Amino acid sequence: MDIRIEKTRQSIINAFIELRSHKELERITIKELCEKAQINKSTFYAHYQDIYHLSDTLETEVVVSIMENLTHPERVLDDTAFFSRELFMGFLAKDSLIGILFSGSRSKCLVQKIEAALKELVFGAYPQYRDDKDINIMLTYILYGC
């Protein structure tokens, strides 16, 4: 990727996180974000559709990062205590970013996104469990217990 594009993207992200740490998502304007990031509005729109797309992209990146750092995701069904600890450690590693991105109206999104990613991970490895209600309940319980 072109380094200029990556620097611009990082500038947008940094400005967004700074604004988001002080404001609700719904109160952040593209104009204010662009001023803080020192970019034109057209530059923002070249990267993201709107402020919600930016927020969703960052939220998804956090969830993917948490899931990628699980050392033994296959143990979710075999050793739920171990898996819960690993998941909790993933949350701790991203604690400040989670606190910013998933605050206010976005607070329920973290659990929903993690649950979807966790089920995708498990059902990708064990497709035979996709329709198993007990496994679905257990995965939800593990997540909400963490």
Predicted regions and their residues:
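Basic, helix-initiating cap at the start of DNA-binding domains
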Residues: 1-19, 23
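Residues in the recognition helix of alpha-helical DNA-binding motifs
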Residues: 15, 47, 57
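Basic, amphipathic alpha-helical hairpins
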Residues: 18-25, 68-74, 94-95, 124-127
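Helix-turn-helix
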Residues: 19-53
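Short, hydrophobic secondary-structure boundary micro-motifs
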Residues: 28-29, 99-101, 110
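Short, basic, alpha-helical segments at the C-terminal edge of helix-turn-helix-like DNA-binding modules
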Residues: 29-30, 58-70
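Hydrophobic alpha-helical connector segments
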Residues: 70-96
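Amphipathic alpha-helical packing segments from all-alpha helical-bundle domains
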Residues: 86, 105-129, 133-144
